[in-house]
Amino acid sequence: MKILLSNDDGVGAKGIAVLYQALMQIAEVTLVAPDRNCSGASNSLTLLNPLRATKLENGFISVNGTPTDCVHLGVNQLVDEMPDLVVAGINHGANLGDDTLYSGTVAAATEGRHLGLPAIAVSLCSHHGEHFETAAAVTISIIKGLASHPLPKDQIININVPDIPLSELKGVQVTRLGARHKAETMTKQTDPWGRDIYWYGSLGTESDAGEGTDFHAINNGYASVTPLSVDMTANESIKAVGEWLADLEINRAG
């Protein structure tokens, strides 16, 4: 098996190093990651500047771009053979609920799927994580399961793992995305030159963390596995929207 590994925390992050060592036990791994922390980059691309890839002494490849850039460049230019799987992580911090809209980790996996490859994103639910080995073990187990249960072509898997020893993990649960309340108000400060600067507030608290959600699984000692659809069409609304569109004046003209 050949795996392309990336992340959004940067090529020097602990999470990706731990996952690389674990994946090397089951596959050939090419690591292509941003040269800096790109948390919150979502699916952004570098379009107005050239990308540069630098091979480091440890064999990892550092790119002056986003997580999506790394996967796109890796698949199209930096590997000798097409990977069998794209893996993104281990992220330093949860990607639960609507976090997934902003996550560079989830975006890296999504780019793999856009390129026609199976893809998974994995996160450890602590920004100061200690038990990356737990997330790595869960990832290996999921990859082995995917070998006989492949994902549909328009889906990826989003894995979140509590920051606990593997011996304390209760298991793995399939979940749906929960939700958070809106983030706290932005903070306004003044820089040394007297100019206004702004900081994002803390993440919102859980607003939908009931049974069956990714939040609920994590809060109860389980790893969460959420299938995500790359096609964001709200199919259940097509008929209703079509009906009121038909009544618009622009559709009645002539």
UniProtKB/Swiss-Prot annotation:
It catalyses: a ribonucleoside 5'-phosphate + H2O = a ribonucleoside + phosphate. Keywords: Cytoplasm, Hydrolase, Metal-binding, Nucleotide-binding. A divalent metal cation binds at residues 8-9, 39, 91. Its cofactor is a divalent metal cation. Its main location: cytoplasm. InterPro entries: SurE, SurE-like_Pase/nucleotidase, SurE-like_sf. GO terms for molecular function: 3'-nucleotidase activity; 5'-nucleotidase activity; exopolyphosphatase activity; metal ion binding; nucleotide binding. Pfam families: SurE. It is found in: Cytoplasm. It comes from the Bacteria. Binds 1 divalent metal cation per subunit. Its EC number is 3.1.3.5. Transmembrane segments: none annotated. GO terms for cellular component: cytoplasm. Belongs to the SurE nucleotidase family. Nucleotidase that shows phosphatase activity on nucleoside 5'-monophosphates. HAMAP family: SurE (MF_00060). NCBIfam families: PRK00346.1-3 (NF001489), PRK00346.1-4 (NF001490), surE (TIGR00087). This is 5'-nucleotidase SurE. The gene is surE.
